[in-house]
Amino acid sequence: AGLIGAGGHGGAGGAGGNQTGGVGNGGAGGNGGAGGAGGQLYGNGGDGGNGGAGGANIAGGNGSDGGAAGHGGAGGSARLIGAGGHGGDGGAGGNTAGRRADAIAGTGGDGGNGGNGGLLSGNAGAGGHGGAGGSSTATTTTGTPPTGATGGNGGNGGAGGTAGFTGSGGIGGNGGAGGTGGNAGVALSVGSTGGLGGNGGSGGLGGGGSLFGNGGAGGVGATGGNGGSGIGPASVGGNGGKGGVGAAGGLAGQIGNGGSGGSGGAGGNGGTGDTAGNGGNGGAGAVGGNAQLIGNGGNGGGGGNGGTGATPGTGGAGAAGGTGGTLFGAPGTTGADGT
């Protein structure tokens, strides 16, 4: 924008094409465009565009992957007075019908960062959320022994923007969930193994305040994907993916409360089989943001629970709360550990 007016929103990224014949990967999704800046005197920043989804592998050629998703665009910043734009969300990773251990579903796109608030006044924009990882959509029946495809990792959340002279910091985006691993085996196959679940994405950092304003909350870590099932005698389920890590809360302004820390995501469950797969570990929580002069510290995030399985996953550690203001304010509480 020029002197007065809002910045334009960024365009969305296009979806990747599907792969429908023979061996090959789904196409990658396009990235979202960045939002425009607000006017020199007054105006909000534009929102970033969302990332495009990754294309799927549909035909199921051996070793074929799902396409990676596009990332969200950054939110535009305000200049003097106005709010920052929100970051765009990441696209979802493409699924795969590939029937081999080296087939991998597409990774989810990362969320874009939020724009900053105006120098004089304005709240900062929130970070975009990470996209979910793709999943396996077919059962592997060949190989010695058959092994399922791997689920895609979730994308990470974008960071919240920083506030201006007065205003709150932006909230961090949440991570995207991990995709599910593929099933493997037939009734008479021996020793088949389910595919691994994808890891959950991490949350984005909370943005800071300036003079008057709260820090933004940190983003939440996402759940890990479940492992695929093993089929037949002596089969083993796939291991669950790890939960994503929470992100730290933002620092408060001189007067204001610190942002709460994001919680960790739960680990994915191990797949079924004659022997179940192991559960994924839960993600750790993140520390709360500190207050500065007057205000309370943000609460710390709790750890995610471990997934179920032959060996259950370990719960993530909870994190400490932020410190209270030096003149007045209480510290934040400590987040609970995951089980």
Positions of PLM-derived features:
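Collagen triple-helix signature
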Residues: A1-G338
